[in-house]
């Protein structure tokens, strides 16, 4: 299974998925969201019934994925697609980088009271061996500096800074 654009790049893809397609399997139904940036064939699965999105390496709690194959513009547009999901959508990402991402956000968004509160919650969860995932679209819009970037230039600068952080 994979994005239709990867059919010639990845051998043996048996199910080709398209942006906006509704994919059904057993009792699950999800919308495919094409989100190039981290890779050229990256997709997210948005599960309507559960109000949950699996973002892989596109969006993390308080961060976003590195650009391995895609461009800044592609990642910026992909994040904007995810931002359009309902505010109470739960986000399940591909890696647990929340604490390190929180340090970067705090260094570049020093007056964000929502972020300060979230960092305390993150530390409390981790101290109690609890996961910091899922987060929600609402929380990420309030605290994730990459989602708060309102233009491509700002986003690109932040992504470069994070790569060196």
Predicted feature locations:
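Core dinuclear metal-dependent hydrolase active-site scaffold
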Residues: 20-48, 52-53, 84
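Active-site HxH/HxHxD metal-binding segment of metal-dependent hydrolases
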Residues: 1-31, 121-125
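Active-site-flanking alpha-helical
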Residues: 44-45, 64, 102
């Amino acid at each position: 299974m994979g994005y239709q654009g990867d059919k010639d790049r990845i051998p043996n893809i048996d199910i080709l998925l398209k942006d906006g397609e509704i994919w059904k399997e057993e009792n699950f139904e999800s919308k495919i969201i094409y989100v190039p940036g981290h890779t050229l064939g990256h997709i997210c699965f948005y599960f309507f019934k559960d109000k949950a999105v699996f973002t892989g390496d596109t969006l993390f709690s308080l961060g976003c994925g590195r650009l391995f194959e895609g461009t800044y513009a592609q990642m910026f547009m992909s994040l904007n697609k995810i931002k359009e999901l309902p505010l109470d959508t739960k986000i399940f990402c591909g890696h647990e980088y929340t604490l390190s991402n929180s340090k970067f956000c705090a260094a570049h968004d020093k007056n964000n009271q929502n972020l300060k509160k979230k960092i305390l919650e993150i530390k409390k969860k981790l101290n109690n061996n609890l996961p910091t995932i899922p987060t929600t679209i609402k929380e990420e819009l309030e605290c994730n500096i990459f989602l708060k970037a309102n233009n491509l230039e700002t986003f690109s600068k932040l992504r470069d800074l994070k790569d060196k952080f």
